[in-house]
Amino acid sequence: MVEYQHLTPNEQAHFVEHGWLRVPNAINPEYLDPWLGNLWTRLGMRSDDKSTWTDEFLKLPRHREVPNEEFCTPEAWTKTIEIIGGEDKIHPYRERYFGDQFIVNFGNEHWKSHDQTPTEAKGWHVDNDWYRQFLDSGGIALTLIFLFSDCPPRGGGTYVCEDAIPGG
């Protein structure tokens, strides 16, 4: 049994009820500026010129990676460890690293004044649904989603479908 030292009772209850937990400021600031510093160069676009934004969203490949425990702030990492039941539950090399494989959502003019309900959203998927899962398969215990910038209303954030999470 895990002895909770970092998750508050409210966070524990929220995770059990909803199947997810928001941890603000979860990214170690040491990685924000260096990783975001060359983002627009990698994209081949200019942040100050929307005419160069040629796609609504792009997925960039990973160029750099660090162990999750370095990438996360200590608060975020210790809460992650408690959620999964202890550090011994993490495979020594699979699922241990996070990198700069950004998914960038540029949006378009339409979304400035239009809302989209979850049922209208495209791209619904189940993570790791492209291979047969086993109890010791990677990526099945907990998915970490990091936001590198604020996500304003209509800003293209990730929907989480609680009804699809068993027990959620």
What are these regions (language model features)?
Residues 1-2:
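Eukaryotic N-terminal targeting leaders
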Residues 7-10, 15-18, 27-168:
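Non-heme Fe(II) oxygenase catalytic core, chiefly the N-lobe of the double-stranded beta-helix
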